[in-house]
Amino acid sequence: MSKENKTTDFGFTQVPWEEKQKKVAGVFHSVAAKYDLMNDLMSFGIHRIWKKQTIAKSGVRKGDNVLDLAGGTGDLAYKFCQMVGQQGKVILSDINSSMLEVGKEKLTNKGCVGNIEYVQANAECLPFPDNYFDCITISFGLRNVTDKEKALASMCRVLKPGGRLLVLEFSKPIIPLLSKVYDEYSFKALPFLGKIITQDAESYKYLAESIRKHPDQQTLKQMMYDAGFDNVEYQNMTGGIVALHIGYKY
């Protein structure tokens, strides 16, 4: 079946394959200005710990080339700029122009200049040379990609041999009671907060649904192997609400 006739998940709704990207773009254009505030409110600030652990496991060193993909408002990119120094380079990339503009303004105001570039790009067809990056991160972005397999293969292509991909993403809670509480919170509190803070409950309803449709820990691990990565491992965080997957290219 051609992609023109295929459907895919947009939250719990099936939409034509080619429409998902437009719908996801609408979500993030809507929430970009309040994205950081909502992250703090939704996660009670815990997202900062998840990202800190991701940075600690990235292995990024001075002189590295790093791609922060679907990097949004630049939380990871800012730290990577400090880690690579002026000898290295960080590319903050996002498919959404509104998110990228917020990230650029935020990082510029924090003094992150000289070793960072901003590139609007689709993860499924990255506009970078083969074997270019030492490290790629994608934080809370993969679940919004239409063709995840294609995106993972594209990431593998642009990684140097010996390079690593880190995927930080919502996953499947491994504690039954936590899963029930998390469901209640996600489907009731998130849209409510979205309505109050961004005047957009529907976008946060989609975000809650998209988490449930994202591949679980083992499925994503196998997808990374299938895309060409080796030694893929994952670490559950906060009882599996979030998982960090790491894969290497050899």
UniProtKB/Swiss-Prot annotation:
Keywords attached to this entry: Menaquinone biosynthesis, Methyltransferase, S-adenosyl-L-methionine, Transferase, Ubiquinone biosynthesis
Listed InterPro entries: SAM-dependent_MTases_sf, UbiE/COQ5_MeTrFase, UbiE/COQ5_MeTrFase_CS
Residues in the signal sequence: none
PROSITE patterns, per the entry: SAM_MT_UBIE, UBIE_1, UBIE_2
Pathway where it operates: Quinol/quinone metabolism; menaquinone biosynthesis; menaquinol from 1,4-dihydroxy-2-naphthoate: step 2/2; Cofactor biosynthesis; ubiquinone biosynthesis
Single GO term (MF): 2-methoxy-6-polyprenyl-1,4-benzoquinol methyltransferase activity
EC number: 2.1.1.163, 2.1.1.201
Protein name listed in UniProt: Ubiquinone/menaquinone biosynthesis C-methyltransferase UbiE
Source organism of the structure: Francisella tularensis subsp. novicida (strain U112)
Encoding gene, per UniProt annotation: ubiE
